[in-house]
UniProtKB/Swiss-Prot annotation:
Protein's UniProt keywords contain Ligase: yes
Molecular function GO labels: ATP binding; ligase activity; metal ion binding
GO cellular component, one term: cytosol
Positions with a binding annotation for ADP: K104, K131, S138, E160, E161, Y162, V163, E239
Keyword entries, A-Z: Amino-acid biosynthesis, ATP-binding, Ligase, Magnesium, Metal-binding, Nucleotide-binding
Name assigned to this protein: 3-methyl-D-ornithine--L-lysine ligase
Enzyme class at the top of the EC tree: ligase
Binding sites annotated in the UniProt record for Mg(2+) 2: E239, D241
Biological role: Is required for the biosynthesis of pyrrolysine. Catalyzes the ATP-dependent ligation between (3R)-3-methyl-D-ornithine and L-lysine, leading to (3R)-3-methyl-D-ornithyl-N6-L-lysine.
Amino acid sequence: MKTICLIGGKLQGFEAAYLSKKADMKVVVIDKNPQALIRNYADEFHCFDVIKEPEKLLEISKNVDAILPVNENLECIKFLSSVKEEFSCPVLFDFEAYRISRDKKKSKEYFRSIGIPTPQDKPGRPPYFVKPPCESSSVGARIIYDEEELGELEPGMLVEEYVEGEVISLEVIGDGTHFAVVKETLIHIDRTYDCHMVTPLPSDLSFREISYSLAANLPLKGIMDVEAISGPQGLKVIEIDSRFPSQTPTAVYYSSGVNLIELLFRAFGEGVEEVKTLPEDRYCIYEHLMLAENGALIPVGEQVLSMGNDYGKYYEEPGIEIFLCRGEDPVFTLVFWGKDREEAENKKRTGLLILKDRFGAAV
């Protein structure tokens, strides 16, 4: 049995832990927060600050097969980059690609340098789409409809043209030479541009070629998530993230059969093969629903889940998995899958009835 060590105990960590368990791996989690969200979901939890106690991390590296950073703490990422050669196992992370992807201005310069379509910067007229330069895209992102609001923006905010359309996503895993473009997904977003649901999409050749080019020109050794707007103007890439994503990997797993953790291990081992075909006859619905005091189930994004204090599996049967995030209001992550959309929708109806029976949810 392989063992993976995850540095970070929040939602990225949960996604990686979940897929690691699907691959029959032992999961070790390190987080400096004693109340880390997934501390009870891990097989083994260590509470310490890797920057202050690096010797503990180096010792753990002797007993695991790989280390995967699953946090967005820049100080932590820089530290891991500085000591990666001292570990007794590989670090499944492309630090240079992360440096580019984390900085949205650098990312856009990279897009333009290789001819990738992306929203125009500082357009001459509203509406504008604004977002922070170095955060996950949903944090602080919003549409501005008039010029006056531009003057009230926080310093450093990026101002782009607002592009109408659906938010779509693709993961790419590279070994530095070969690049596996995996499965397209649709990102269902709420009013704060946070994702509350993920569903699979049919193959999109243009998006696949763009994603391959973005990975190959780095060249990527690790994982990268590509997000784009698909609308009347065609595809426009809005961001890349060279870190293990949350939410989409589970939908990818059930709709394609590809486990991104297993593929990431291969990228740092025997190498990856470029994906030629994927099964088209699978479907998955992945969503977050918060149970309000009145029993209503409200779609919520990751920002709400991240405020919880414990996250783990609640219910499972073929085609259905329900995870419970405990906090001020319980939040459920529901995963339904089947051979097609109809079967997945039927599983969803069954899952919602479970929440009705056990929690009094209004469905």
